[in-house]
Amino acid sequence: MHSRKQRGFRKLITQEKLQAILARLKSQEGVRGVVVTNMEGLPLSSDLDPETTENVAAIITSLVGKALDAVRELREGSLSFLTLDTTKGQINIAPDVSEGVILVVLKN
């Protein structure tokens, strides 16, 4: 008999808990948007308008894919976090490959 983990099952977070986490992130000073996407670029949750959400999800998913490849090629372990400093603020990206999700926080 295989354990649930061995068969590829993942512990799923409830929608209620996810919304509580997102609300807590959004309440932080300077946060202007939070997006959760899967590794294929499909938005799972967002507090941004639909067009911006889809744009962020697609672009960040592509960037994370490139970053994962770079880290693997450089033999630097595994990617845990990316920060992009921009003229408008900061984009914090936390990919979780084992769970198949990417958390994106846009800050002023």
PLM regions with names:
Residues 1-108:
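Non-catalytic interaction/Regulatory regions outside core domains
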